[in-house]
A protein has these predicted regions:
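Acidic/polar loop patches that form or flank catalytic/metal-binding clefts of enzymes
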Residues: 372-379
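Conserved motor-coupling elements within RecA-like helicase/translocase cores
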Residues: 381-395
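ATP-dependent helicase/translocase motor core
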Residues: 2-347, 356-372, 389-393
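Glycine-rich and small/hydrophobic secondary-structure elements
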Residues: 350
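Short beta->alpha hinge that forms the Motif I/post-I loop of the SAM-binding pocket
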Residues: 353
């Protein structure tokens, strides 16, 4: 495996600024077990706690401990049973409901024994380093259609939010993709259904490593059930998996390099809490590295303009150049969404130079979040929108 060397990085940046692998990549035989051991060792060195959890009971027990620690609250046994059965492992909820819970409803209400209510965070999105990361491997599920044993899973506050499937070097990467596909069909839903909380999947054969959202996999299952067979690329296909990269868009394919960048704790937590979008169509999208870089550079420019009193000047501006089909609308949506949460931002304006772009952009924004944007046809409407304090994000 290559050696990783960070040339330039910022504690605030999700994507490493520049990286340069040293040494030649090993093509020597390495078993899947050896690759898995090396991966877990590297995660442990990066601050992940390794746990020997191989069954549902141990996973649920650890989940209770981690949620108690995150929320600084000890459940009674009766409270935990109610909260787990209704809020976490509800038999009527599937992958989409659980994705919505993580992305939009991560604070759940506990009904306490004394009749009062308490907010319980599943994940802390404001202070990401309050979240606790653990790694488990060879988890076994025996209550599905078939017995399955999963490779490596990342737990965030006890919930499995990232799953990694490995193949030995030389094996086609798509085999790992197909294996996760089988797990979804046969066993992720089984038992308490906690593996339906997985937001991001990572597949690697050591030499090449990619990631994708749970919707990429889940859509494939639904499409098969509906009897659809499409020749073109769809969002559920292997082609919609993504490589990780540095800020210069240099791909980081090797598992060691990928682990030191993508699985850096602040990077992974930022991706999970900021750079996933659960759309109005109930699909989960995870942004690509160049989209994250563009978003953070725009936000950084806004911060600098505010801190150095450059608002309203040319120095406060800038531009991002992305090619056709690169997902510019999604980048602009996420940028606007995050910018609107800044305490000194009241309104975010999005200006296009063609009417067809206006319609297309509004349609896409509505897909990302219903009612997220308001269009206008003349300056009178624009004036009313700007003067309407009720629509300011901090007044909602």
């Amino acid at each position: 495996m290559s050696q990783f060397n960070v040339i330039l990085a910022s504690s605030e940046s999700t994507v490493v600024a520049e990286y340069e692998p040293h040494g030649s990549r090993s093509d020597a035989y390495q078993s899947e077990a050896a690759l898995e051991d090396a991966f877990i060792k590297l995660l442990s060195e990066q601050g992940y706690e390794y746990l020997t959890i191989h069954d549902s009971n141990a996973l649920i027990s650890n989940l209770r401990v981690q949620l108690e620690k995150l929320n600084k609250y000890n459940f009674t046994d009766a409270e935990w049973k109610r909260f787990f059965d209704h809020n976490i492992s509800n038999a009527n909820e599937g992958i989409e409901d659980k994705s919505q819970k993580i992305q939009e409803d991560s604070v759940q209400v506990l009904k306490r024994d004394d009749g009062t209510s308490k907010n319980i965070m599943l994940i802390d999105k404001k202070n990401i380093h309050n979240n606790y990361l653990q790694v488990i491997n060879q988890y076994t599920e025996n209550s599905g259609n078939y017995d399955n044993r999963y490779d490596v899973t990342i737990l965030v506050n006890g919930l499995p939010l990232v799953h990694v499937e490995l193949k030995r070097r030389g094996v086609a990467l798509k085999e790992a993709f197909n294996q996760i596909d089988r797990y979804q069909r046969d066993s992720f839903w089984a038992g308490a259904g906690l593996y339906e909380y997985v937001q991001i999947f990572v597949i690697s054969n050591g030499t090449h490593t990619k990631y994708y959202s749970n919707s990429t996999r889940f859509s494939a299952i639904k499409e098969r059930e509906n009897g659809k067979r499409k020749a073109q690329k769809t969002s559920n296909s292997f082609e919609f998996t993504s490589f990780w990269a540095d800020a210069g868009n240099k791909i980081i394919p090797d598992l060691v390099d990928f682990t030191k960048t993508f699985f850096a704790k602040h990077t992974l937590l930022n991706i999970l809490t900021k750079y996933c979008i659960f759309t109005s169509e109930r699909m989960l999208m995870v942004m690509r590295p160049y989209q994250i870089v563009a978003t953070e550079r725009i936000l950084n420019r806004i911060e600098i303009a505010n801190n150095y009193k450059k608002m309203g000047t040319v120095d406060a501006g800038g531009y991002i150049w992305h090619t056709t089909g690169s997902g510019k609308t999604l980048t602009s949506f996420k940028t606007a969404q995050l910018a609107s949460k800044l305490p000194y931002i009241d309104k975010v304006l999005f200006v296009v130079d063609r009417k067809d772009l206006d319609y297309q952009t509004m349609k896409e924004y509505d897909r990302f979040e219903k009612g997220a944007a308001n269009g206008n046809r003349n300056t009178a409407v624009l004036t009313r929108q700007l003067e309407n304090r009720a629509n300011c994000p901090h007044n909602r």
